[in-house]
Amino acid sequence: AAQASAASASAVEQTLIAALGKRYQSDEPIEDLYVWSGDYADAMREVYNQNSNDYDVVALFTEAMMNRTPWQLWDPRSGEPVERADTLECLTVLEKAIAEINGNGATRHPGVLHLYIHLMEMSPFPEKALRVADDLRDLIPDAGHLNHMATHIDVLCGNYQAVVASNSAAIHADKKYYEQNGAMNFYSLYRAHNYHFKLYGAMFLGQYEPAIDAVDAMIATLPDELIRMESPPMANWLEAYVSMKTHAYIRFGRWQELLAAALVVGAGQ
């Protein structure tokens, strides 16, 4: 459909449409889309070279490179970039864009900021992303995941109060989505992730009430039928969240509450 409409698109949109053809090279479904990730990243590099001042293109290009080696950008032992990854190119592209945005007063770009956080959170120097985290924080108040993203850096730098506060804001935003769409969707994974982060931050702060409130609210919005959904296999991602109240009781030494807790037979019970 995009290719059919390409003639009426802008020049940059036409190059993006052409690049997508490298991302999805067959009309038939395949088991592993990663086989085309390199082709797509190479195509997006060409788009970027022609449009390096377009921050939408910056975000799409960086994402394409990062998805070649997801969660394998830095060697956790040496702290060096993984040799087969595009880590340093991502760093150069994103830091150039961020410097330009800060220098010319352009509108902060959530995609650029979001990806920089993901790039730096597994690096040996996550603190380099603290300003970017603050720039993304509250930038799009109704986007729960983006309210949350700054805390990927906060938690690594010991800013646990911000972890609790920003994930509380994310949970508030997510409630709007939940009230409209319910729990039976993949976004419930992202909602649970925000509750989990709030719980984690509260445990580091020694704050029992926000910790237990977070886990109770999370469990209340993860019904058993969601966990048992087979396609997509939601239990693969969500079942572990159901055990987190036990973790909270142990962390705070609430042994009587732990002994009194009912055995969880199914999620939400």
Where are these regions (language model features)?
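Short coil/linker segments at helix-helix boundaries
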Residues: A1-N53, L60-N104, L113-S123, V132-D135, ...
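Oxidative protein folding and maturation machinery
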Residues: K245-Y249, W255-V265, Q269
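Solenoid-repeat scaffolds in large eukaryotic assemblies
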Residues: V58, C90, H114, A129, ...
